[in-house]
Swiss-Prot record:
Residues 127-419 form the NR LBD domain. A motif (9aaTAD) lies at residues 412-420. Nuclear receptor for calcitriol, the active form of vitamin D3 which mediates the action of this vitamin on cells. Enters the nucleus upon vitamin D3 binding where it forms heterodimers with the retinoid X receptor/RXR. The VDR-RXR heterodimers bind to specific response elements on DNA and activate the transcription of vitamin D3-responsive target genes. Plays a central role in calcium homeostasis. Also functions as a receptor for the secondary bile acid lithocholic acid (LCA) and its metabolites. The gene is Vdr. Residues 97-126 are annotated as: Hinge. Calcitriol binds at Y143, S233, R270, S274, H301, H393. It is found in: Nucleus; Cytoplasm. Zn(2+) 2 binds at C60, C66, C76, C79. This is Vitamin D3 receptor. The lineage of its organism: Eukaryota, Metazoa, Chordata, Craniata, Vertebrata.
Length: 423
C-alpha cells in the first residue's frame, strides 16, 4: 500500500484500449499503469521507489547483463534496477513522505467533498419518476412521428393548384348537421379512451369524382387541409391531457376550460418536433406534408402570427430540450390555474406545482451544463410567448371564421374549441 501511495502516475495509454494487455517493461509481469514515467507492475514500482529512497547500490553477482523475468526478478537487484532506469523510470517522480501524506489528505478531502455534493444533489423521487414515465407514455401514444394519418385529411393544395403526389384517398365529410351541438362533440372527444380520429367526422371511401374531393384553388387553398390537421391535433392533445397525473381529478367543466384555452399552445409546442431550422418549415414525413410560411398564410394567417410563431419555434428548438422536459412543459401548459373560467383554481395549481417541481428537479439532476443554465426560466418564458401567440391566433381565427365561406371549411371540433363566429 505504501508503494501505491508514493507513486505518481501519468495518463495510461492502455486506457484507450483495454483489450491490449499491458506488460511491465522491467520483468514482463502484468502492468498496472505508468509509474515514475514507465509502464510497470506493482512489484517493480515498489522496488524502484525503495531503491531510490535508500540510495541503494547493488552489484551484479554475474556479468551485469541478467535477463529479468517475473520469476527471477528478486535474484539480481542490480540488473533489475538498471532495467528500471533503462525503460525510463525517474527518481524525480518519487514523492517524499511529506508529499505522500499531503496527497493522501487531498484524496481523502476530495472524496469527502464529492460525498457531500452527492448527498446535497437533488434526486428525482419515485413519484416524480412515475410522473415522467406516465407523461412519456402519454406522448408516445398520442404523437405519431410517421404522420401516417395525414393521408386521411383533405389534401394540401398549394398556390399552383398541385397536391403533390395526391391520389384518391378516403375523404373526410361532416356527418349530419355541422351546426349540431358542438359541446356534445367536444365532451365525446374528451371521454374517448384513445382518441385516434375525428369524433365528429366519418371516413368514407368515395370515388375521386365525388364533389367532396374537388380541389380548393381559392386564396385560402390550404385551409381545409390544415383545418383537418388542427382538428386531428386537438384530438391528440385531449388524449395526452387525460393521462396527465391529476387531470382526471378535475371537474369536467374545468377539464374542458383548460383544454379549450391551451389547445393551440400545446399544438404549437408539439409541432416543434417536426420543425426544422434548415428551411424554417415543419417536415411531417414527405414533401406533401412539409409546411412552410406560405402554406400557413394560405390557411388564412398573416405575418402578425407567422413571424412570432417561427421565432418561437427557433427559440424552443435551440433549448435542446430532453423529451422528458418537453412532455412536462406540455403538461404544465395545459394545467394552468390562471385560465379564464377555471373554477377550482387551487386544485389546478396543486397539480401544476407538482409538475413544475418535477421539471425543476429533472433539470438539476439530468440536464448537464451549460444547457441547463437558467433552463427552467427559459422554458417558463416560452409559456408566456405561447400566451401571446394564442391571443394573436384567436384574433385571426375570429376574423377568418366570421366569413361563412371559410367557416364551412373548418371542422365542428375546431369551431367548438376556437369558437364559432357564425350564429
Amino acid at each position: 500500500m505504501e508503494a501505491t501511495a508514493a507513486s505518481t502516475s501519468l495518463p495510461d495509454p492502455g486506457d484507450f484500449d483495454r483489450n491490449v494487455p499491458r506488460i511491465c517493461g522491467v520483468c514482463g509481469d502484468r502492468a498496472t499503469g505508468f509509474h515514475f514515467n514507465a509502464m510497470t507492475c506493482e512489484g517493480c514500482k515498489g522496488f524502484f521507489r525503495r531503491s531510490m529512497k535508500r540510495k541503494a547500490l547493488f552489484t551484479c553477482p554475474f556479468n551485469g547483463d541478467c535477463r529479468i523475468t517475473k520469476d527471477n526478478r528478486r535474484h539480481c537487484q542490480a540488473c533489475r534496477l538498471k532495467r528500471c532506469v533503462d525503460i525510463g523510470m525517474m527518481k524525480e517522480f518519487i514523492l517524499t513522505d511529506e508529499e505522500v501524506q499531503r496527497k493522501r489528505e487531498m484524496i481523502m478531502k476530495r472524496k469527502e467533498e464529492e460525498a457531500l455534493k452527492d448527498s446535497l444533489r437533488p434526486k428525482l423521487s419515485e413519484e416524480q419518476q412515475h410522473i415522467i414515465a406516465i407523461l412519456l407514455d402519454a406522448h408516445h401514444k398520442t404523437y405519431d412521428p410517421t404522420y401516417a394519418d395525414f393521408r386521411d385529411f383533405r389534401p394540401p393544395v398549394r398556390m399552383d393548384g398541385s397536391t403533390g403526389s395526391y391520389s384518391p384517398r378516403p375523404t373526410l365529410s361532416f356527418s349530419g348537421n355541422s351546426s349540431s351541438s358542438s359541446s356534445d362533440l367536444y365532451t365525446t372527444s374528451l371521454d374517448m379512451m384513445e382518441p385516434s380520429g375525428f369524433s365528429n367526422l366519418d371516413l368514407n371511401g368515395e370515388d375521386s369524382d365525388d364533389p367532396s374531393v374537388t380541389l380548393d384553388l381559392s386564396p385560402l387553398s390550404m385551409l381545409p387541409h390544415l383545418a383537418d390537421l388542427v382538428s386531428y391535433s386537438i384530438q391528440k392533445v385531449i388524449g395526452f391531457a387525460k393521462m396527465i397525473p391529476g387531470f382526471r381529478d378535475l371537474t369536467s367543466d374545468d377539464q374542458i376550460v383548460l383544454l379549450k384555452s391551451s389547445a393551440i399552445e400545446v399544438i404549437m409546442l408539439r409541432s416543434n418536433q417536426s420543425f426544422t431550422m434548415d428551411d424554417m418549415s415543419w417536415d411531417c414525413g414527405s414533401q406533401d406534408y412539409k409546411y412552410d410560411v406560405t402554406d400557413v398564410s394560405k390557411a388564412g394567417h398573416t405575418l402578425e402570427l407567422i413571424e412570432p410563431l417561427i421565432k418561437f419555434q427557433v427559440g424552443l428548438k435551440k433549448l435542446n430540450l430532453h423529451e422528458e422536459e418537453h412532455v412536462l412543459l406540455m403538461a404544465i401548459c395545459i394545467v394552468s390555474p390562471d385560465r379564464p373560467g377555471v373554477q377550482d383554481a387551487k386544485l389546478v395549481e396543486a397539480i401544476q406545482d407538482r409538475l413544475s417541481n418535477t421539471l425543476q428537479t429533472y433539470i438539476r439532476c439530468r440536464h448537464p451544463p451549460p444547457g441547463s443554465h437558467q433552463l427552467y426560466a427559459k422554458m417558463i418564458q416560452k409559456l408566456a410567448d405561447l400566451r401571446s401567440l394564442n391571443e394573436e391566433h384567436s384574433k385571426q381565427y375570429r376574423s377568418l371564421s366570421f366569413q361563412p365561406e371559410n367557416s364551412m371549411k373548418l371542422t365542428p371540433l375546431v369551431l367548438e374549441v376556437f369558437g364559432n363566429e357564425i350564429s
